[in-house]
Design a protein with these regions (language model features):
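Cytochrome P450
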Residues: 1-396
């Protein structure tokens, strides 16, 4: 019945949504802005106003559901709770992640780490920036934010990989993995001394010092969420921004001529290709939304990628325009009570990484033999961003 009532949604395949979703999302947004997707076994929301409505109404569209895969791996957290429980888990982290607090704590360390990574690749004249800059920078910053310097970035990445693989296995219909359990237990053990340090030592130590009744285990569960979001989406955010700019010489030239445009260029990149393309909610009751008969318990998938290209809000929505006046109206960081708590840190990392690249590698360009193409159903970024430049002359 649902497939017959929503034929465009019924036609959409996982392969389309993973490789090149935007033509499909455009058709759905125009004709079936909320559509039943058999491929996703849920309702897909593609129009911006409806996406915002769902994200801003946790009483009707909740994250608090046993099917939420992240909660099965790391336990309850601000990501998987709503209402008073969500506020209790999120509140201790709100202060340390304020814009002013992030700038004061991280501006210099992020710049230093970006320069260190660029120093390592500069003499070669070529690099794969996702794995040699974007990912390592995101991982290093998260390591510092969580106070895990003693463990080291490589160890933290190992835990991250195990936790992500377990979440992915659950999403695909499997069970939590033993490796994921061990990864989370290792993170928990490493967090214990980090949480006992003075609040100035890390963002999570600051949150633990103002935990407002959160148990240590609950703080660790939220730290695992920050680990996941701080690496996966920030890496994608940086990789996508570099790819968007370097693929469009006119836009790159505008940013080089007017560096202040980079702030808006990052927002425009987030709009055009959000690193997190979809978010899940679950209907708490029967409800009709834009004519769609949603039943309590149904999965409701908000397409951030679809909302961000809504022509009712963004003129020429498929174009990348660093001067777009309303680029910041994107929903890449979600909306409502679950708006991304780490967005200020992610923006700082992306802006710093791209700015330092453009400043230090003056003729930075894409490798013509390897054009980056974003892919991914949930998290979208290019597999590789291969670039080249003229190596700096050796010091005399």
């Amino acid at each position: 019945m649902r497939a017959a009532a929503f034929p465009l949604g019924a036609e959409a395949t996982l392969a389309q949504l993973e490789t090149d979703p935007h033509p499909v999302l455009a058709r759905l947004r125009e004709h079936e802005p909320i559509s039943w997707s058999p491929a996703l076994d849920g309702w897909l929301v593609t129009r911006r106003d409806l996406a915002l409505q769902v994200m801003r109404d946790p009483e009707t569209f909740t994250v608090d559901d046993v099917r939420f895969s992240t909660g099965q791996v790391v336990g309850p957290s601000m990501l998987t709770l709503d209402g008073q429980a969500h506020r209790r888990h999120r509140a201790p982290f709100a202060g340390p992640f304020r814009l002013d607090a992030v700038r004061e704590r991280f501006t210099e360390p992020v710049a230093a780490e970006a320069d260190r990574l660029i120093d390592a690749i500069a003499p070669a004249g070529e690099a794969e920036l996702r794995r040699e800059l974007a990912g390592p920078l995101a991982a290093a910053v998260v390591t510092v934010a969580l106070g895990l310097e003693a463990a080291g970035t490589a160890e933290v990445l190992g835990w991250y990989d195990a936790i992500v693989a377990s979440v992915t296995e659950i999403t695909a219909g499997g069970a939590p993995t033993e490796a994921g359990r061990r990864g989370f237990e290792a993170l928990r053990a490493a967090m214990e001394p980090a949480l006992a340090r003075e609040p100035e030592a890390s963002l999570v130590a600051a949150a633990a010092g103002d935990a407002g009744g959160l148990a240590r285990g609950e703080v660790v569960s939220n730290a695992a969420v920050l680990l996941f979001g701080g690496i996966e989406t920030t890496e994608g955010m940086i990789a996508n921004a570099v790819a968007h700019l370097l693929a469009r010489p006119d836009q790159l030239a505008a940013v080089r001529a007017e560096p202040a445009l980079l702030v808006n260029a990052i927002e425009e990149s987030l709009r055009l290709e959000p690193a997190a393309a979809v978010i899940d909610r679950y209907a708490t009751r029967d409800v009709e939304l834009a004519g769609a008969p949603i039943v309590g318990g149904d999965l409701v998938i908000v397409s951030i990628a679809g909302a961000n290209r809504d022509p009712a809000v963004f003129a020429e929505p498929d174009a990348f325009d660093v001067r777009r006046a309303n680029a910041k109206l994107h929903a890449a960081f979600a909306a409502g009570p679950h708006v991304c708590i780490g967005m200020h840190l992610a923006r700082l990392e992306a802006h710093t990484a791209v700015a330092r690249l453009l400043e230090r590698l003056e003729d930075l360009r894409l490798d013509p033999a390897h054009q980056p193409a974003p892919r991914g159903l949930v998290f979208r970024k290019p597999d590789t961003v291969r670039v080249c430049w003229t190596p700096p002359a050796p010091a005399a």
